[in-house]
Amino acid sequence: MAKFHLNIKLLSDLCVSDGGVYNSIIDTDCCHDEAGFPFIPAKRIKGCLRECALELNEWGKHIDICGIFGEEGRSDKGAADKRAALRIGNAYLEGFEAMCEEAAIHHGHVLFHPQQILNCFTSLRTQTSISQETGIADPHSLRTMRVANKGLVFTADVEMPTSAFESVKACCAVFQQMGIARTRGFGDVEVTLSAAEQSGADSANTAASPGLLPHADFLDYEIRLEEPLICKSIAGGEARTLDYIEGSKILGLILERIRENMGGQSAVNAFLEDEALRCSNAYIGCGGERFTEVPAYIYSIKNNKEDYVDQRYHRQVPEGIQLSQMKHCYVRKKGKDLFTLDVSVEERYHHRRPDDKSIGRAVSKDDGSNFYQMSSIMAGQRFYGRIYGTERQVETAYTCLAEKESAFLGYGRSAEYGKSRIRIISTGSSKDDGTDNCVSGTELVVRLNAPAIIYNEKAMCSVDREDLLEEILSSLRISKSDLLEYEIYVNFTTLGGFNVTWGRRKPVVPAFDKGTAVCIKLNRSVTVPSEMFLGERCMEGYGEASVTGPDADPQNGPAPDPGRMQYGDYLECATSLIRSGSIISCDPISYNHPLPVSDKGQHRELQIDEIKIASGSLGEKLADRMFLTWLGASARENVQDAFTAKPEKYRPTVSNLLTGLDGYTEISQVEKMVVSRYGKKSSKKEEKLRYAQEILDKAKDEFGESKERFCKEHGIAGWDWPSEAYDRYQLTYLRELLVAMKLKIRSTIIEEQEE
């Protein structure tokens, strides 16, 4: 696959909306990320290119639409060899990586607030609907739309075979419009396709990976999401994603690379011969640590967000306290502190235009159009998993993952979704030191870290507790006669799947869900492995379980107090800025100093530490826009003492100055215009000249202190203005002062009339 750049230059304002509404002022918002940078979603680009290909085919040029863009509708219709040849990423602003890094460095400063960044690249457009009968605006038709500014250039990464280059280039040549209101002057674009420089980042992954240890039989890896990831669920398909990455997706990635680079299907069959292979699910993590599902025996206290109760020890609930099983979340325990980490999920809205392309939006189901939403795991999060197997299998998996860091996972990965980076963390052997991989004692706790498919003696899928217990005892090689007591805490789910090779769905079966726990007490001490897999389809990650000893022994002392439940600062990881192969991560979680639960989910207060603005940087653009806004506010504050006589006497002078400002670039030019206009012998003109000179002198005096005040208020240590910027800012302040004076004069006249 060759890499290219798709460049989109905006010839007019553009609004590409994701269907979300983020405040009460804007009815239709454009797509932008958490940092405030606008972008163009890849699915919109791919859809427009596909429409261009349809037009070209109608004009007589043959383009293999299904081969390049894939089949319309569900991507799981066909086999793996029918995937789209074209892969498009989101289109970001030119210089995005540098701007993103600058924003991350100054994260928390008022100048780099996401709203400031968004306002720097976008504008608001307000429209209404006019009644053809009355000629006036229809009631409740006023609406506001945010648009990306004309002149911006966006760049998208494209991967495709070189054989498809000419066809896609032809589509770009006729790609002229996109987005909302394209028949009303919005969305004019110029699209070009160019070759991309090969960075070599993927080939460098082998050198960056840790060495493969001798006799290694497991491999730990980290998945870093650069784009949202869709892991379709049984409940809602792509409309409701799972919040973890199934082991089957990692297994499929490895098999695909084996098939492409190591000898085809015969190499795949050889790799799968030994059933020792296990690809665990990848779960959310932070600071290099993997979090797992909260055990079913952990209960929360109603109206208490700081404490939890372990039902294994606290059977009697004090009067007035209500317990409920803790809701789904991922946890990691440190002593008695339970740290939780939630997976950030987002909804994105999409639509398919009708078969009649003259209609620009989804109208009804009968015309082939469709409006739908897709749920996905947000980009910027990290997931951790492990691959088990024989030495040969682990070596093969290591080679496949180390040779190429970038990978595309999940549903919809041909556009906008699924781009990830996989990094090998470590390898090891369970045979080197058995003490760390085993648990000894008479009391054991077996906890499912992944859903488990258990079959009973009749070869039927079962969710009977006794069948689960028998499966655990059999796997641990413990006789049922050794069992004294047991207690089972269960969660249930249903599982399915899709076989891409066959193009068929797997059967939906009931299963024990992750978080299920079995506590057993034996009449003898045993030594068992601390990790194991139960049930069926273990190769895909199902049935992963951990075995531990009890946290405390109530028989040898008082029951432990309720543990303290505290939340880690997971927002730092969830909002890491990751784009185009570069990552700017925040500090990992500090378990020694966790945030109190009251701070969970809250934004940090804006800092005003001094920063220095470099010429040509994002900070200079933001400071320029923010300073212009600040000048208007400053002028409105200073208007109260702008009059030395009655305000109404200034009215003609203020109006004339406002009208005459157009076309001037320096305030000295305005002064000459004032003298030439009012420099006559007439007493009225002398009075107007005096008023005009008062206003100009006031504007110059107040503006002289404005830069120092602005920098002090907003924590800016150095900001060098170009000479042309000084004149522009000074004229802007004069204009804002005149507008404020005009409003003040008008309000004064109205007040006098009312009196």
Positions of PLM-derived features:
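Intrinsically disordered, low-complexity regions enriched in serine, threonine, proline
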Residues: 122, 140-143, 345
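A short, acidic, amphipathic alpha-helical segment used as a generic capping/interface helix at domain edges
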Residues: 136-141, 496-508
